[in-house]
Amino acid sequence: MEKPLDQRRFIWIIDDTDKIVHVNDAWLAFAGENTAPQLTANVVLDQPLCRFIQGQETRYLYQQIFSRVRAGVSPVKFPFRCDSPDCRRFMEMKLSLLSGNAVEFISHLLREEWREPLDLLDNSRDRSGEFLKVCSWCKRINIPGQGWGEIEDAIEPLDLFGHHTTPRMTHTICDSCHDAVKLELGLE
């Protein structure tokens, strides 16, 4: 029997200086359920959001999004992925302007695809000094000479099972996700 789709809304708010000032109970529960139990209210509140965003390109794009939302392009919606070792999670995020230049984030699950667990996505695994580029939005891996593909498609060409230690992942944004976000923001 298929598991019912999670209907919760995961909400967090940043103030005008981009510090996290609110996370709802659903957000905290989701973090605890999905390989990030360390993300408690005590850890995330009053911290700059950029502390929790990996990759220079991704941080820069979020800054562009915040600027556009604060300039009146609100709400902004875009799809993203929030995968775990055993599940692809397709989600949507909506950013809306609140009073005082605060920004509210509301994300929700669109669909899930369950799979065999992948060590590459297990945060508890030891990591080598090698790096794989992963898109922060769609979670595809950059496969040199082939472009961006699902993690399962990258296993053989990148010899991921041949490594004694799992490579580290460095976050960026692929061209198609970058173009989609820019289009949503009216930057094209």
Protein language model features and the residues they cover:
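PAS-family sensory modules
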Residues: 1-16, 45, 65-71, 97-188
